[in-house]
Amino acid sequence: MLKNDVWIRELAERGGISPFEPSQVRRIDDRPVISYGLSSYGYDIRLSPNDFRVFRHVPGTVVDPKKFNPGNLESATLHHDTSGQYFVLPAHSYGLGVAIERLEVPNNATIVCVGKSTYARCGIIANISPAEAAWQGYLTLEFSNSSSADCRMYANEGVVQLLFFEGDPCSVSYEDRQGKYQGQEAEVTIARV
């Protein structure tokens, strides 16, 4: 069952979302921001200003998810102007960022991550795997810029929405099976096998 704001707030009070914003934030110091925080049936997390990487072409190489070469990624520059802090995701490229919020998923829940419409209308597709039962850490966020124009990715502002689904307790959680992305730190985690 999809969980509501009351359930999400209780999860946060137990340390399940940290830091936690108990309402939708749309402005900071009279400046409009891409919304983040608690909504009726979800929670919008923010993009960290600390780590954003963009794929680059390395002649003679092919990206191999089984033997991922970190050299295929380059750190993006954090820019700042009156609109806020942002990274630039070039046209037709792919970038990896990390969430500001740390998550601890209950044993009987799974979190599905979906893109925000503000970014989707600019050609940005968010592709984040679900956070399964008992997963904990900082989500690595994956973004594809499908448009023919470069796009700003705003740090410290909303970037994806989390939907929380509760079910019957599972027999083996992500933590139990020692999932390879368990305990991710507040930095981009590259592909693992």
PLM segments and residue spans:
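Non-catalytic terminal segments and appended small domains
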Residues: 1-193
